Regions:
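A structural detector for beta-sheet-dominated domains
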Residues: 7-9, 23, 55
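Short amphipathic alpha-helices within nucleic acid-binding modules
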Residues: 27-31
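Short, mixed-charge low-complexity intrinsically disordered segments
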Residues: 34-70
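Glycine-centered signal
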Residues: 1, 25, 61-62
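Short aromatic-glycine-(Arg/Gly/Cys) micro-motifs in beta-strand/loop hairpins
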Residues: 1-15
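Residues marking helix boundaries in flexible regions
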Residues: 4, 22, 32-34, 59
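A short, exposed loop/beta-hairpin motif centered on an aromatic-Gly-Thr core
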Residues: 13-24
Length: 70
C-alpha cells in the first residue's frame, strides 16, 4: 500500500485534494470517485477519472511539516 495525493482538476467541484492509501494510482482515483458517489446518495458520481490527477506515491519523510490527511 502507498499514500497518494489525488488532486481535483475540475474547479466546478470542491477543489479539495485528498490523500488516499491505495495499492495503485488508479485505485486511489477510484476511491475518491466512490467517495463522491456516496456524497451523491449512491447515484453515479459527477466526478470522473478525467477530473482527477494523482501524485505519488508520497513518502511521509518527503514532508517537512506535520499535516492532516483528509
Amino acid at each position: 500500500m502507498h499514500i497518494y495525493e489525488v488532486i481535483m482538476l475540475n474547479t466546478e467541484y470542491d477543489g479539495e485534494d485528498h490523500f488516499v492509501i491505495a495499492k495503485s494510482k488508479q485505485r486511489a482515483k477510484n476511491i475518491v470517485i466512490d467517495y463522491y458517489e456516496q456524497e451523491n446518495d449512491g447515484y453515479m458520481s459527477p466526478v470522473t477519472d478525467h477530473d482527477l490527477a494523482v501524485n505519488g506515491p508520497v513518502e511521509p519523510e518527503d514532508y517537512a511539516e506535520e499535516m492532516l490527511l483528509n
